[in-house]
């Protein structure tokens, strides 16, 4: 049995197969498979245990360790948040970034007339400041998927990528 201490200012609520972690910046919900992991919340501690089924011992032990690491990162992120920076780089055509609701648009990439667009996942906040794009959120998966979506729409289809290196690139991650 593994136990995790819940930091001050963080709250954990257990439903059937999901654990809701709430902090000062917001909340995130972590789902788990009760076939492999059993979770109990008692006061300011979370107890994790592997399945007693002998056929699933190895798999459930690995699942418990993974879920424990996920919960540690989640409890830190609901308190401090996650921020990533991306940089807008272009050499040929000056592109502009526009955000409308949960949509992210890149206009004039490679001189294209139709803007490229993608979605912003979950409660992630995206801001454009000059040549930098700041992505902030509470859930590390939502922030990561938003970055992946932005990188995916910047792919230069039909162009020599050694020459056409225009796009939005991940600059640094602030923890």
Question: How would you label these PLM feature ranges?
Answer:
Residues 1-175:
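Ribosome-associated RNA-binding proteins
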């Amino acid at each position: 049995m593994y136990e995790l201490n819940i930091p001050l200012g963080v709250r954990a609520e257990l439903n059937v197969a999901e654990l809701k972690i709430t902090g000062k910046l917001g909340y995130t919900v972590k789902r788990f498979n009760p076939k492999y992991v059993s979770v109990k919340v008692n006061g300011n501690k979370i107890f994790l245990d592997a399945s007693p089924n002998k056929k699933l011992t190895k798999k459930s032990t690995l699942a418990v360790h993974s879920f424990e690491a996920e919960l540690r990162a989640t409890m830190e992120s609901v308190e401090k948040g996650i921020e990533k920076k991306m940089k807008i780089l272009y050499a040929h055509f000056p592109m502009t970034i526009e955000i409308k609701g949960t949509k992210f648009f890149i206009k004039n990439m490679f001189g294209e007339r139709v803007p490229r667009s993608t979605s912003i996942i979950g409660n992630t906040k995206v801001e454009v400041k000059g040549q930098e794009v700041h992505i902030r959120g509470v859930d590390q998966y939502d922030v990561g998927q938003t970055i992946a979506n932005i990188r995916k729409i910047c792919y230069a289809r039909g162009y020599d990528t050694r020459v056409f290196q225009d796009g939005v690139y991940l600059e640094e991650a602030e923890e």
